[in-house]
Regions:
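Surface-exposed, charge/polar-rich loops and edge strands
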Residues: 1-415
Length: 415
């Protein structure tokens, strides 16, 4: 059963939440982060992308970057932009996108639950990305970005959160330029905290929706702290990592599309003929071909959009991973036809997440005379089944929207 405990969040003072809240560090590039930081001195990107406050030639993984992140975090606390609560609390975090509401609870998951697979994963991580966040967490002495978790809520837990919302005023309520509304309620009542903790203990598993690298890094820092503190009790803050848990059926997964920069030395005609071996192909004149069901793909190649429907032998009788559209595409097109052996490391492939328009795929493909593929979104049910079976998805199979903002909650590793 899941351990999910209250904590003393370091969080924006009243009136500062909208200015502080920032997209996750890995959603914005260096130039975008620098532009945001230049306009907004309170943006949490000064912590999560601290290279913006160093000379432009500074390497992203230089020790100076992590030290600057630590300095910037301390400065935000010293100047009163961030203030720590004086007792452990839970926090309701509600996001509204295009009229759809998702309501989660912020707290701290256990590194032991991660190690024992109560916190379930569905993706591999890259060691270089892990090391970056390990250094960031360790030097800052804090989890600065929440892990996006999902689970099957109990009815009582949902009722507790709704009741608290009705009876209390939100601490934060702001809408950002992307028209996503963020609301936070602080649950500081002892009885409510105890009830929520009890309900969380009834939940058998938590699923990482987004944030595999942040989670793995937080756990490794926790294990490092245990080695440094052999008399640890398990109650120390470093035994836990910052998370927000949502009901799985409230989450939205968008498509994660692919663009390959060339045709692997082949002609357009050769590529089309090879793809026809495994797909029923229909040309779609004049506009992007958006897949409307599982096992359908949109493809843009040489000025034309095509709708591809996988032949049944590609997925019938396969396990849940083998039936994923991202796996089918890798197994019969990206690998054997286009030569993308390892999509994690091959620089010829670009992944384009969720909210980007299909016209952008077309533009990217045209720039290098490559090919683009639009996928149908993976379902939460497939994600959870894969995690339950301890299997792994291909990289970049899921794109969650809306993204949780960093800076709304910080979990200090020394309490």
């Amino acid at each position: 059963m899941a351990v999910f405990r209250a904590f003393k969040a370091l969080r924006p003072t009243e009136g500062k939440a909208a200015a502080v809240a920032a997209l996750p560090y890995d959603v914005v590039n260096r130039e975008e982060a620098a532009a945001i930081g230049k306009e907004n001195p309170d943006s949490f990107l000064h912590v999560d992308r601290a290279e913006m406050d160093l000379p432009a030639e500074t390497d992203l993984y230089d020790a100076k970057v992590y030290q600057k992140a630590k300095e910037n975090l301390h400065k935000m606390e010293e100047t009163g932009v961030l203030v720590q609560d004086n007792k452990p609390c839970y926090y309701i975090y509600e996001l509204v996108r295009k009229g759809k509401v998702q309501t989660g609870i912020a707290g701290c998951a256990s590194i032991d639950d991660y190690l024992n697979n109560v916190v379930k994963k569905h993706e591999l991580t890259r060691s270089d990305k892990e090391l970056d966040r390990i250094n960031h967490v360790d030097v800052c002495d804090a989890n600065t970005g929440p892990i996006y978790l999902a689970c099957r809520y109990t009815d009582a837990l949902s009722a507790l959160l709704e009741q608290w919302k009705k009876e209390h005023k939100a601490a934060y309520d702001f809408t950002e330029e992307d028209e996503i509304t963020h609301r936070v309620w602080v649950i500081d009542g002892d009885e409510a905290i105890s009830q929520i903790q009890g309900e969380m203990e009834k939940i058998p598993a938590l699923y990482i929706a987004d944030g595999h690298h942040r989670a793995a890094s937080a756990v490794k820092v926790g294990l490092k702290r245990r080695q440094e503190n052999p008399d640890y009790t398990g109650e120390e803050a470093f035994n836990y990592f910052l998370s927000v848990v949502f009901p799985y059926d409230q989450l939205t997964i968008l498509a994660y599309n692919r663009v390959v920069r060339d045709l692997n030395g082949q002609s357009v005609e050769d590529v089309l003929e090879k793809i026809k071996e495994n797909f029923d192909m229909t040309i779609v004149p004049g506009f992007p071909a958006k897949p409307v069901e599982k096992h359908c793909f949109g493809m843009y190649l040489d000025g034309f959009w095509y709708l591809l429907k996988a032949k049944s032998e590609l997925y019938e009788g396969k396990d849940v991973v083998g039936q994923l559209d991202s796996q089918i595409l890798q197994d019969v097109v990206l690998g054997p036809v286009l030569g993308i052996g390892d999509p994690r490391t091959d620089k010829r492939i670009k992944f384009v997440g969720g909210s980007h328009k299909l016209r952008e795929l077309q533009t990217l493909a045209d720039e290098t005379r490559g090919v683009a593929f639009a996928l149908y979104p993976t379902s939460m049910e497939d994600l959870m089944q894969i995690a339950d079976e301890s299997k792994l998805m291909p990289p970049k199979s899921t794109w969650f929207e809306p993204k949780l903002r960093s800076g709304i909650f910080v979990h200090k590793l020394r309490g």
